[in-house]
């Protein structure tokens, strides 16, 4: 699960003085990455944590203590990761169990890298016991579980004890590349079982992990589970995918004068040239297939892989159209004979001539979030093609990623590719690029800015977040205003970008000042002895894309801290935030987060509280609220009208807030939880409101899943509960939103 490179969902933060006395919010851990985890003495690590309401980070200590004391602090560490979703993936679990049973036929040394809860290690130990009893062998085998992340190691030991496996599996709390034969393990391993795969296949460090294992930890010609992984791709046309990356051409159609991407600077604001994980089935009706699926790379686990590889593919177009993206996925062959497979392919794929592969494809009940398809955007407007035209695709890979480059035989030249990053280039997430290209969003924001600056002369405007759009818009629309941009995430990069686009947007850099460094508080010295008349934010904070919606109330906290430099009649934009919610049917998402019991014969009930599962958790524990793009969560349906839960008034200092609402159900169905988000009221007249709800596909919503699904019905029906009462409270110190509900 996790080995050479740590990679989990990005949590949400809370400034801590000690790990043992504080309760963390869900999503409060920095992305687990070698730079964010530091080893100390044995049984102790540093973990980087971020406070969502200040943007500050701090190293805290996680110690290996008695399990009786570590349950409360550990829950948030792992509840926001993909472990629970992965363990609920029955297709995956079954495939690994069948392959391990088939591969381990005699006593041997098995190494499990990135062992997680120890599921594969226990499968290996059980298979070895069975093989030994069948063969009546007197020799002994061994199973070694290698897991580098201390909270996961502690959880694995609980699971092993619960299943009576603690003496059959040896646990080592190290990275796999730190293991030494003769020091950590007595001999090289005969069999490797491992699952260190992400949606792209390589992103969790599969290649360097296998390289080190073959060099230092495995016998020559070892057996492995999985045996092989093959990546596949398909060319697609999709305007939705195009708008996620090509801001230059999308913006050219805008009716306003703002140019975030001016002519001859087409890549100055763009997405990273990489594959992006996405549930492509959710947009299948917006995709036009332009080719048959094609094989790209094969990676054999049983031999040492190369760090770099390339292949040139000849692909025949099956339709006229424009190639906007390469959609890719992978298929695992888990056994050497080729009878056990697992696929992450989209549901529109079929293998009519290979029933073994056909059975690997996900069905309607097989949705999972830990492995998705991947999308690689074709630069610019895409590549126009004609049916039966032959396309040349050059695919390359390095240690951790796969990339693509097109060349057309007719033209004999490569199409424009992503430029090498420059100092003034901004790399933003696809959803942020799409927001900046959305004509309705731009119109609303510009209308609000025009109203705000109208009649103001030589005013001081303060942009508190990372909004380059607002900064440019104010400077463009108010030539006499002076704009100070804090850019807490973009910093100097944002300043260089503004300088590069200033001429195209009709403003001078004399109008704009980027502080370029984080400051706890601004003083009158920073504002040149002037009071701020306009304080604005979208709000958008660079790098916080995986936060819960209400953690953008950092804007409110920063507005409060800036009170000493605000004019008495200062205009705050947005002026208000409204917490909205609706009841949802989310069967696929709920199944992926449900409590675990038996997994292929092994009791995993010990992990439920720690992983934040939905179900019968001991009081007062409950599953956390987590951020999701609801439209990508498999089957989903709204069961109520949208209702207001709570309001946040930014004209006043940040404070604790409470809200209560009664909701009537509009659909007779099974309710799995509630979606929550914030609508930002931009102007004081309440006439311009920007919603971030489920209908807006570029924002994540917070999802509060129920402990158990509830049957609901409409008013007057006899089919279950007809209404629910929601109570919420917001903690301004931690950024936590507490949610309680009662069905009636």
Positions of predicted regions on the chain:
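Class I SAM-binding transferase module
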Residues: 2, 33-113, 118-744
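N-terminal chloroplast transit peptides
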Residues: 1-28
């Amino acid at each position: 699960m996790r080995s050479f490179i740590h990679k989990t969902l990005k949590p949400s933060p809370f400034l801590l003085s000690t790990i043992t006395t504080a309760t963390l919010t869900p999503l409060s851990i920095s992305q687990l990455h070698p730079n964010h985890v530091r080893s100390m003495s044995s049984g102790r690590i540093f973990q980087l944590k971020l406070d969502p309401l200040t943007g500050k980070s701090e190293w805290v200590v996680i110690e290996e203590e008695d399990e009786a004391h570590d349950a409360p602090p550990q829950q948030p560490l792992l509840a926001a990761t993909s472990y629970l979703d992965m363990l609920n993936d029955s297709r995956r679990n079954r495939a690994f169990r069948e392959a391990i049973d088939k591969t381990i036929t005699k006593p041997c040394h098995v190494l499990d890298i990135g062992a997680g809860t120890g599921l594969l290690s226990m499968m290996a130990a059980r298979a070895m016991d069975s093989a030994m009893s069948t063969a009546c062998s007197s020799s002994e085998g061994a199973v070694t579980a290698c897991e580098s992340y201390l909270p996961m190691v502690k959880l694995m030991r609980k699971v092993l004890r619960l299943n009576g496996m603690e003496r059959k599996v040896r646990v080592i709390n190290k990275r796999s590349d730190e293991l030494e034969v003769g020091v950590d393990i007595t001999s090289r391993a005969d069999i490797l079982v491992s699952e260190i795969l992400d949606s792209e296949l390589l992103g969790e460090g599969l290649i360097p992990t296998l390289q080190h294992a073959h060099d230092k930890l495995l016998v020559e010609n070892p057996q492995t589970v999985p045996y092989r992984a093959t990546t596949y791709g398909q060319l697609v046309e999709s305007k939705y995918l195009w708008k996620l990356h090509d801001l230059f051409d999308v913006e050219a159609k805008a009716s306003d004068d703002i140019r975030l991407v001016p002519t001859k600077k087409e890549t100055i604001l763009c997405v990273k040239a990489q594959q992006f994980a996405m549930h492509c089935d959710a947009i299948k009706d917006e995709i036009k297939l332009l080719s048959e699926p094609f094989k790209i790379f094969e990676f054999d686990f049983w031999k040492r892989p190369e760090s770099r590889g390339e292949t040139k593919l000849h692909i025949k177009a099956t339709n006229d159209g424009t190639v906007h993206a390469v959609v890719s996925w992978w298929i695992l062959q888990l056994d050497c004979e080729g009878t056990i497979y697992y696929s992450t392919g989209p549901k529109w794929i079929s293998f009519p001539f290979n029933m073994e592969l056909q059975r690997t494809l996900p069905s309607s009940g097989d949705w999972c979030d830990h492995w998705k398809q991947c999308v690689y955007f074709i630069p610019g407007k895409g590549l126009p093609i004609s049916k039966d035209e032959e396309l040349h695709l050059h695919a390359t890979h390095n240690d951790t990623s796969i990339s693509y480059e097109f060349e057309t035989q007719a033209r004999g030249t490569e199409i424009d590719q992503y430029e090498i990053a420059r100092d003034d280039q901004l790399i933003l997430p696809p959803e942020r690029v799409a927001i900046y290209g959305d004509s309705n969003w731009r119109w609303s924001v510009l209308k609000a800015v025009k109203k705000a600056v109208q009649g103001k002369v030589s005013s001081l405007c303060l942009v508190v977040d990372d909004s380059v759009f607002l900064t440019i818009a104010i400077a463009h629309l108010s030539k006499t205003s002076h704009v100070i941009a804090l850019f807490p995430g973009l910093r100097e990069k944002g300043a260089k970008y503004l300088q590069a686009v200033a001429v195209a947007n009709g403003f001078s850099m004399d109008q704009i000042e980027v502080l370029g460094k984080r400051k706890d508080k601004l003083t009158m010295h920073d504002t040149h002895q002037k009071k701020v008349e306009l304080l604005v934010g979208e709000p958008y904070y660079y790098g916080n894309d995986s936060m819960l919606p209400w953690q953008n109330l950092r804007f409110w906290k920063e507005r409060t801290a800036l009170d000493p430099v605000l004019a008495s009649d200062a205009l705050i934009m947005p002026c208000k935030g409204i917490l909205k919610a609706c009841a949802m049917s989310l069967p696929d998402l709920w199944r992926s987060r449900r409590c675990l019991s038996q997994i292929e014969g092994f009791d995993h009930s010990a992990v439920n509280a720690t992983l934040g599962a939905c179900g019968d958790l001991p009081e007062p524990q409950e599953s956390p609220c987590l951020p999701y793009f609801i439209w990508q969560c498999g089957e989903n349906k709204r069961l109520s009208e949208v209702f207001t839960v709570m309001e946040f008034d930014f004209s006043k200092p940040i404070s604790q807030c409470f809200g209560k609402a009664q909701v009537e159900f509009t659909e007779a169905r099974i309710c799995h939880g509630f979606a929550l988000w914030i609508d930002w009221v931009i102007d004081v007249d309440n006439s311009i409101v920007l919603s971030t709800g489920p209908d807006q596909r570029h924002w994540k919503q917070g999802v509060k899943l129920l402990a158990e699904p509830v049957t609901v019905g409409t008013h007057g029906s006899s089919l279950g509960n007809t209404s629910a009462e929601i109570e919420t409270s917001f903690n301004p110190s931690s950024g936590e939103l507490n949610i309680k509900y009662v069905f009636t």
